[in-house]
Structures are given as C-alpha cells and as structure tokens.
A protein has these predicted regions:
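RNA pseudouridine synthases
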Residues: 1-121, 130-134, 141-220
Length: 220
C-alpha cells in the first residue's frame, strides 16, 4: 500500500524508529503503518510537520535542492533582528565553510499565539521599529501549543518569532543560521512542506494524506 503520512512531531522525539540508546523517544511508539519511513528529518529538539511514506520516490522529490521544494519554519529567537540581519539570512549564511542557499526570512506579525504565555509578558511586536515592522508578513492563524518541557526565558532579553522558507535542509541549518546573526533559536517548528500546512493536526498525531493533500505536498 502506497501511503504518505503527515505527522506533528513532538519535542524530544527522534526522526527514526529506534532510540539506539538515546534518552529521547522514537517513532515506533506512534503506531504508524508498516514499512513507512521518514522523509528527511527533524532534530529531536525541533517540532512540527514530518512526512513518512513507503514510497521511495518521495525522498528524492522532496529533499533534493534541484527541485526547489519549499519548507517553512517558525523559529522563536532571542532579541529582535534588524532588517539588515534578516537580509543577511535571506542572502545566505556561511556555515562551516559553506554558504546556505538564498531563502526568505521575515518577522511574523502578528506573533503566533502560545497558549500558556502569560498575558503580562511583553509582546515582541511592541519592540519592533517602523523599519523592521515593514518587513513583517502576516502569520497564519496557527496557535502554537506549549512545548513540553517549556523553553527557558530570560526576562531581561526579548524574543520574537521568525519565519524562514528554505529549499534545503542541512543538519541543524535553521539553528545555525539564526545563531550566526546573533539570535539563538529557542524553539523551532516546521509548519509547511510544499503547499501542505501543519494547521490543526494535534501534537503527536498523524494522518494519511488524501490525493489532494499529496498534490499540495508535491506543489502541483
């Protein structure tokens, strides 16, 4: 049976079926159909949309940069990047002697809602200069659930959510990119692959994609 599955991977779960001695959880506990495997990966400390399939062709189709297949990430970072920093991300960052491919990077505005954030916490939107705000794109209506365990905030350091749209996926690439411009990533979610969005798929849940949803993934 040929299937393509969308899975909302929780924090602390490996993108593999066995733990190999790791303290993290593995995919085996989520009772996927037999003979499926993850297409690409998300680090254990990253969350969001992960695809699985028993059809090998999806791997090359979605992962090879020559197909320019988009993946969208939301990254919660320390401090508020300047327009120059966002432009630097978009043009490419040198990481370990290799420059990343050009991408899209923007400040999400309004900022995504996290259900357990205290109302008294200062909104990142209030920290934006007019010049920086001009680079903002609308965030989707996705409400982000709290992470378990929660991230550690530094009260003296503001944070905000960035959107990044990449066509490549090197090891810990988004985290290394934001760190290179002085904005360490606190939390990272993949919210879209091709035209398929994470939307309301609950954390830790998966679904077999319909024919129409498969077309969204493929960008058809």
């Amino acid at each position: 049976m040929v299937v393509l599955i969308a899975f909302n991977k929780p924090f602390g779960v490996l993108s593999q079926f066995t733990g190999d001695g790791s303290p993290n959880r593995a995919l085996a506990e989520f009772q996927f159909p037999k003979n499926v495997y993850p297409i690409g990966r998300l680090d254990a400390d990253s969350e969001g949309l992960l695809l699985l399939s028993d059809e090998p062709a999806w791997n090359e189709r979605l992962l090879h940069p020559r197909h320019a297949h988009e993946r969208e990430y939301w990254a919660q970072v320390e401090r508020i990047p300047t327009p120059e920093s966002l432009q630097q991300l978009g043009l490419g960052i040198s990481i370990q002697g290799r420059k990343t491919l050009p991408c899209r990077a923007w400040l999400l505005e309004p900022q995504p809602e996290v259900s357990n954030v205290a109302a008294s916490r200062q909104s990142a939107a209030n920290c934006l200069s007019e010049e920086t705000a001009a680079l903002c794109r609308d965030a989707a209506t996705l409400t982000i659930p709290p992470r378990v365990p929660p991230i550690r905030f530094r009260k003296s350091v503001p944070d905000c959510w960035l959107g990044l749209e990449l066509i490549e996926g090197k090891n810990r690439q988004v985290r290394r990119m934001t760190a290179a411009i002085g904005h360490p990533t606190l939390r990272l979610l993949r919210v879209r692959i091709g035209g398929l969005k994470l939307d309301d798929l609950a954390v830790g849940k998966w679904k077999i994609l319909s024919a129409e949803e498969r077309k969204l993934v493929a960008g058809e």
